[in-house]
A protein has these predicted regions:
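Single conserved hydrophobic/aromatic residue that forms the stacking wall/gate
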Residues: 1-8, 12
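The start of beta-strands in P-loop NTPase/AAA+ ATPase cores
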Residues: 8, 48, 123-124
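ABC ATPase nucleotide-binding domain signature region
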Residues: 14, 19-77, 158-161, 165-184
Length: 184
């Protein structure tokens, strides 16, 4: 628990939160999402947002990928939902599996599609280590999805190459002196 020592007002643009394990990156993101309260001061986000935590808890374990995508998109016609799932690499069989049975990369792509393709899409997307535990093909697909996202991103990641692939230059970074905001 390390405080942000100065008041910060950040306009919405793409940002990364970086630092070593245990420094509080996920806690900062959870505060922005309204899942944790600040110990001191206040944290306020005044735009609608979507939050994908490391466990992708937004995905109902028993619901199929097809059902989830249709629910997120207010009754998207089944044929269009199946086409979108095929583009994500989920064939007709995998589209009917419960979300809990999908691989990490499949779950992440499905969760992102549910957020990005929803109407209206959230103008702010918070992602907690989306590049963890996924294969290279899924990572490249996630990078492409995020580059096409029209809203602002705040991403927690240890992977400098992933952050660079998303063209994120502004960072809230943990250093030996505490949290530092770096703008490129």
């Amino acid at each position: 628990h390390y405080p942000l020592r100065r008041q910060r007002q950040m306009c919405i643009r793409d940002r990364a939160i970086t630092g070593p394990n245990g420094c509080g990156k996920s806690s900062v993101l959870a505060m922005l999402a309204g899942r944790l309260s600040a110990v001191a001061g206040a944290c306020r986000v005044e735009v609608p947002l979507a939050y994908l935590d490391q466990q992708l808890s937004c995905l109902p374990a028993a619901q199929s990928a097809l059902e989830h995508l249709r629910r997120c998109n207010h009754g998207l016609p089944e044929a269009l939902a199946r086409t979108r799932l095929m583009h994500l690499g989920l064939d007709a069989h995998r589209a009917l599996l419960p979300c809990a049975r999908l691989s990490g990369g499949e779950r992440l792509k499905l969760a992102l599609a549910g957020v990005i393709d929803s109407e209206p899409a959230s103008p702010l997307l918070l992602l907690d280590e989306p590049d963890n535990h996924i294969d290279l093909d899924s990572l490249l697909a996630v990078e492409a999805m995020l580059r096409d996202y029209r809203g602002a991103l705040i991403v927690v990641s240890h992977d400098a190459a992933f952050i660079e692939a998303l063209a994120i230059t502004d960072r809230l970074q943990w250093t030996a002196q505490g949290w530092q905001y770096e703008r490129a």
